Amino acid sequence: MRNKLLYILGAAMLLVSCGTEIGENERLEYVAPAAVGKNVLLVDFTGQRCVNCPKANEEIESLQKQYGGDTVIAVGMHSGPLGFKGTPKVLGLATDLGDTYYNHWGVEYQPTGVIDYLGKVDYTAWAANVTERLKKQTTVSISATTEGEGTDLHGNVSVEFSDAMVRGKLQLWLVEDSITAMQLMPDGSPNKDYVHMHVFRDAINGTWGQDLTAVNAMGWNPVVPYQYTLNESWNRKHLWLIAFVYDDSGVLQVIRKHL
């Protein structure tokens, strides 16, 4: 009888505690993720001799884990004084074209990012800037095909404008994932087995792309053909086509397409 009474009293106390009102400041509220209005292009000016660049890569990984690699599209632009173009024995990832972009944007240190072609951003501020750009609405949609075998690459890029009086440029880049090459780490030590992702390889249609103009043409949908001969040393299975449309207001839309 005594045990039964203790059980009843315990249950009553539990019910009372469960019914205790939680203060307004103590309640957990669900915060929905920001709605995505467009994809975002993040150009990471990086280098194999840049000790802080692995930290920037971690920031990219975090953003892509949160939003997806098809939404936050990264390009590792190996360039500048900390870039490395290689020797006969050591693989380098920097390019002359990468240096051209580096100088154009006036990059002063690495790692530095350029988000949606809107200017330089320190990697510690990438998350906030990317989040804001994701909220922007766009009037441009892009789709692409990638065809060919071996070193042959060809296809079409379709750009649809849902607004009149649209002007911009279409830029096509190639990037490669999963390249094992030397990288200086934050402690200054060289890591010969570092895996580099989204490494810029080349621009398919010129340094600054090609003009696209739609004047009073609601729903105009140009189809742009392209053709390119791949470097034999690149791994086709790890290559991506990056296609984006930009104007003076920045990148209007960007996509990536696996080869």
Model-identified regions with their sequence ranges:
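Short N-terminal helix-initiation segments at or just after the protein's N-terminus
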Residues: 19-23, 54-57, 186-190
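Small-side-chain structural scaffolding
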Residues: 17, 46-47, 56, 113, ...
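Intrinsically disordered, low-complexity boundary segments flanking structured domains
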Residues: 27-29, 60-65, 101, 127-132
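Local sequence-structure signature of Cys/Sec-based thiol-disulfide redox active-site neighborhoods
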Residues: 31-80
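Intrinsically disordered, low-complexity segments enriched in small/polar residues
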Residues: 5, 28, 65, 192, ...
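Bacterial Sec-dependent N-terminal signal peptides
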Residues: 1-41, 51
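Short, conserved sequence motifs used for protein processing/export or organelle targeting and
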Residues: 70, 76-259
